[in-house]
Amino acid sequence: TESTIQSQEYRLEAFEQFCREEGIENLNDLSGRDLYAYRVWRREGNGKGRDEIEPITLRGQLATVRSFLRFAAEVDAVPEDLRTKVPLPTISNAGEVSASTLDPERADVILDYLQMYQYASRVHVIALLLWHTGARMGAIRGLDVDDCELEQDNPGIQFVHRPQTDTPLKNGEKGQRWNAISDHVANVLQDYIDGPREPVFDEHGRRPLITTSQGRASTSTFRTTMYRVTRPCWRGAECPHDRDPETCEWTKQKTASKCPSTRAPHAIRTGSITHQRNCGVPSDVVSERVNATEGTIERHYDMRTYRERMEGRREHLEGLE
């Protein structure tokens, strides 16, 4: 079907980008080592406009690469056995759902710290938007200043699919939407825009909301930001892993993701969605807000316990005898 073709094209675009970055211009130059490196590269969320992905999604994307290499072998473009060197992750039923999430209590502590000590900084804005909206990292990265209506009685931000200027939404035009934000979030964004935001344009002449001195903040900026602020020692808290921050290698930027306490942007999204459901926000409202189907939310994002789900249904059953 047309949707299947589009999905396969999207998956192979990431593989094509990896090959370009690695200087691989001919399929004959591909090796098993390259294919394993691609698996790691994609798992960690590399690729323009891409987010970190869960094992079940990674398996699907690697399976598409396998299918492509099988076709390439049929036309003698690559060795017959090359596709077998694409390493597919083993997925169990339990492994199809990530247990990595950010608890609301930790989110509150982090945001309170940023509110107190790094108010309206880029770090504060990234963490606040990821948690408050539950949106994907790529969607927040793609926001422009003009996508924000902050001085209205009902402030909001608009997510727009702009693939021609390097900020696509995962679900294309179907992912376009307005998200309501609280007055507090609107005030923080306005103070960031009026204050520490770097007043720069990106290479397409757009005014990004979240910037560095070089232009629009990169996905690696988002990831390193969240790895840093979710590490307890960053805000002076005791290390839960009995490490000395002065000597711990996890405090370095390149190895921060290895700390068991750190959380990637995708885990912030998971925690936010679970929190919204725990607060009684209907699943269809959450679905539209975070641009994911109710089935996807139920299976991959809603980390509530069975007890918490029961409590969420209780208010709807009060009229029953």
Task: Tell what function each PLM region has.
Residues V290-E315:
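Catalytic-site neighborhood detector that most strongly recognizes the C-terminal catalytic loop/helix
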Residues G142-D191, R197-E203:
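Conserved tyrosine-mediated DNA breakage-rejoining catalytic core shared by Y-recombinases
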Residues D76, L129-L143, C279-V281, V290-A292:
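A short, glycine-centered helix-capping/turn motif at helix boundaries
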Residues E315-E321:
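C-terminal secondary-structure termini that scaffold catalytic or DNA-interacting sites
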Residues T1-V97:
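N-terminal core-binding DNA-recognition domain of tyrosine recombinases/integrases
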